[in-house]
Amino acid sequence: MIIEPRMRGFICLTAHPTGCEQNIKNQIAYIKSKGHIEGAKRVLVIGASTGFGLASRITSAFGCDASTIGVFFEKPASQGKTASPGWYNSAAFENEAKKAGLYAKSINGDAFSNDVKQQTINLIKKDLGQIDLIIYSLASPVRLHPTTGVLHRSVLKPIGATFTNKTVDFHSGKVSEISIAPCEGDDIENTVTVMGGEDWSMWIDALKKENLLANNATTIAYSYIGPEVTEAVYRKGTIGKAKDHLEATAFSITDSLADLGGKAYVSVNKALVTQASSAIPVIPLYISLLYKIMKSEGIHEGCIEQMQRLYAQRLYTGNEIPTDDKGRIRIDDWEMRADVQEKVAKLWLEATTETLPEIGDLEGYRSDFHNLFGFGFEGVEYKADTNEMVNVSSII
C-alpha cells in the first residue's frame, strides 16, 4: 500500500515501515561514528520501542556491543492497516542487530503486568543469565495495577489553580492562549501510580528475587524538569508529583541493591519531540523556541545524541557518576544553561502566530514529529508501494 501520514490532533494514525527502518539506521550510524563505549554487556530496556528507551537500546547494542532484551507494548500491522511506529522500529532494530551479530530479543505486552515480568525473567534465565543494566523508560497514560486490578489514569494538570499560558498548534502554527483547570479528587494519586516509581521498583525486586541482577548492576529511569514557563503544568503539576516519586524511588532501589553494589539513578533529559511531549499543552511552543536557540548555539541534541552522551560522558567514564545535589544525572545541562533559558524566556514573550515562523523552529518541530512515525526521511521512496506487514523477528 502507499502509506501517507494521517493526523488526528497530536497523533499520527499511520507509520511508515521503511521510514522507521531509516530512522533506526540513522541512529545506529550516529552511535558507530562516536566510537566504542566500554559499558554494560547485558541490557534490559523496559519501554524499548520509541524515544529515549529506543535510543538507549541502540546505544547499548551498537555503542557497547551489548546483548539487549526490549520490552514494549506496540500494535502489529493488519492487512491494510499499519503497525504502530514502535513495532516497525523494533523490527528494524532486531534486523540490524542480527546483521551485526548482536543478540536482540523483544517482548510485546503490558510492562506493568506480572505476566510480562515473568516472560522477561524466563527469557533472561534462558539466554543471558544476568543483567548489568536496566533502563526504565515507560510513557503510558494508564496502568492496570497488577496487585489490585484497578485501572489508573494519569492526568496532566496543574495543582491548586487554573493555569493559563500560550500554546501552539504545531500543525497550523497558530499560537493561542490555553487554560488548564486544576486537578481534583484522586488525580495526583492516580498520576503517581501510573508515572511514578512503583513499577520500576517492582521490576527490580522481581529480577533481584530471581538472582538475575549482576554485581554492580545499574538501573536508570528518565525524568524531566524544564523551565519556569512549563512548571505549573509539568514539574509543579500532577506529572511533577509522579516524577518526584520516581526520583525518590531511585534511592530506595539503591538501598535494596546494596548487597550487590548496585545503583539506581534518575537521568534528567532535555525537552524533545516525542508522542508524549506533543500531547502536553505549552510544551510544543517551548520546544520550538528552544530548538531555535540550541541549534543556533550548536548544542541541539535528539534522543540518540542525548543517550550517547549519557553513556559515554556520565555512566561509563571509569569514574564516579556525576550527579546534582538531589542525586540525579543531568543531561539537560545544555538546555538549562542560563544563557539559553534567558533567550527562550525573551522569545516566549514575543511569540505570536505571526512571529513564530521567524523566532521559533516550528519546521524543526514538525520534522521531528513526522520522523517519529517514519515520515520525512531522505532516501525513502514514500510514493512506492510498501508492505505494511512487517514482523519483529523474535516475536512469533
From Swiss-Prot:
Binding annotation for substrate: Y224
Domain of life of the organism encoding this protein: Bacteria
NCBIfam families on file: EnoyACPredFabV, PRK13656.1
Catalytic activity, as annotated: a 2,3-saturated acyl-[ACP] + NAD(+) = a (2E)-enoyl-[ACP] + NADH + H(+)
Enzyme Commission numbers on file: 1.3.1.9
UniProt source species: Flavobacterium psychrophilum (strain ATCC 49511 / DSM 21280 / CIP 103535 / JIP02/86)
Known pathway: Lipid metabolism; fatty acid biosynthesis
Functional note: Involved in the final reduction of the elongation cycle of fatty acid synthesis (FAS II). Catalyzes the reduction of a carbon-carbon double bond in an enoyl moiety that is covalently linked to an acyl carrier protein (ACP).
Assembly behavior: Monomer.
Chain positions of site Plays an important role in discriminating NADH against NADPH: E74
Pfam families noted in UniProt: Eno-Rase_FAD_bd, Eno-Rase_NADH_b, Enoyl_reductase
Protein name per Swiss-Prot or TrEMBL: Enoyl-[acyl-carrier-protein] reductase [NADH]
Gene name, Swiss-Prot/TrEMBL: fabV
HAMAP family cross-referenced by the UniProt entry: FabV_reductase (MF_01838)
